[in-house]
UniProtKB/Swiss-Prot annotation:
Protein's name according to its UniProt entry: Heat shock cognate 70 kDa protein 4
InterPro entries attached to this UniProt entry: ATPase_NBD, Heat_shock_70_CS, HSP70_peptide-bd_sf, Hsp_70_fam
Assigned protein family: Belongs to the heat shock protein 70 family.
SUPFAM superfamilies (alphabetical): Actin-like ATPase domain, Heat shock protein 70kD (HSP70), peptide-binding domain
Amino acid sequence: MPSMGIDLGTTYSCVGVCNEKGRIEIIANDQGNRTTPSYVSFNNRECLIGDDAMNQVAMNPVNTIFDVKRLFGRKYSDSVVQSDMKLWPFKVIANKFDDKPLIQVDFKGETKTFSPEEISSMVLSKMKEIVEQHLGEPVTDAVITVPAYFNDRQRHATKYAGTISNLNVLRIINEPTATAIAYGLHRRGIDDMKVLIIDLGGGTFDVSLFNIEDGIYEILLSGGDNHLGGADFNNRLMNHFIDEFKLKHKKDITNNQRAIFRLRTACERAKRTLSISSLASIEIDSLYDGIDFYSTITRTHFEKLCSDLFHSCIDHVETILNKCKLDKSLVDEIVLAGGSTQIPKIQRMFKEYFNGKEFNNSINPDEVVAYGAAVQSGVISGKGSNFPQLIFLNVTPLSMGIETVGGIMTNLVERNTHIPIKKTQTFSTQYDNQTNVLIQIYEGERTMTKDNNLIGTFELNGIPPAPRGVTQIEVCFDVDIDGILTVSAEDKTTKKVQKITISNINDHLSKVEIEKMIVDGEKFKQQDQQQKKELIESNYKIYCGDENTLDFEITQKLLGSAQSTEMNE
């Protein structure tokens, strides 16, 4: 059976298929387009997906959903969600139990709510249908791509969306990795190179630096922003024209959903026009209160409106190179992916930054991610025998560990560790006759857990009473190939095990937040180490005084009971 690779994009999605002979093909939809809008629309009769949904959005804006990927892994109360909602015509509400965002629509005469994952599953089902109609046979095996900086919760959301769309999700891979796979196939025989992948799509920006040597693609570092892309450029245009309309006609259109979406469509069209022309027109009959709206914008003005966003892209690239201590002149290849990399100003800025270096444009940037994902699907499902052997070494963006004595962060997996990886460490109980242990899991670069991000907790119960330091608890961190973390704790005496797959991170960490955690980790390193030393000395005195306040880490250090093992899979 063939397998497929799906680039589930914020604004457009693309699907490629790997047939039984290992041949890769990007599949066009029933409109003849090789990319499909990530739109879903509900009406009194049916649910429309893709081009059909987008084409009727002006008539049904409040029930047409798009940009849903921006809601993955976020809370309704998130300031980013609140900001996006102002320019969305559809209604987003909070789940009263967990503050997760839900989309509310009218469907067949009833009010319905859908999770972001459910909406995305409909888009995935459409991509599956496109492949099956083209091949004339069922296809269920799929590799789905995500931005490199998607956290564990967002990866779970993507995998869940695939599962409920009746896909067998072979793997979740990073978009830059998929791009690198496609690049590797088109440049067979390359070796010992530094390759920079720049992926600027509709809603996210990823940049990854790869070292290619002996067929091994090692990610040296990844960066980017999960909330930077073509949709943000559209929003800048929209806000500009909303202000212009208000200035000319003394009327605010922001509360009229139909007007907002008609303007959004016109702005998207103008943005595309400005990639090939120096001037674009906005012409919307009866936009609001019977007022026709006609205006123009130059490419120069558009570039000024988005100047800070464009420069942010350069800043992310510079950060990656600085952290890797690599001079930009030593980058051998620059590969562009994502439709927004075709904006002339973006290309010009990157070319100037890299002193005129030409980009690698061997694959269509709108299709390269799906192409690489399709290759990976073929390799996993055993149809990739004609592909060169490519080994990819992905890394963790942040350190992960548990809280120990006095709120100290004990890392089991360090930042930039290659995955998949499994690490175990043995700890001891804190109190005499302790019968349960609370495991608190954090990510971040600070010494104290209060300065890091809590991503999960669970409890190991039923521990037989014993003097403190006697009972051995083995904690295991297992990060799989998809970057998803599972943590387990085992009582070595009873063999009782509790585990949790971390899919309930309290807050989505943006690239800015992750970078801040890394910078703070370096900035406060000396101060944190001194605080840790004082805590250890304090707890040592308490231990000698026979007071029952020792925690895992101190107990295992003082009693010499710590064991650590590592297994790269």
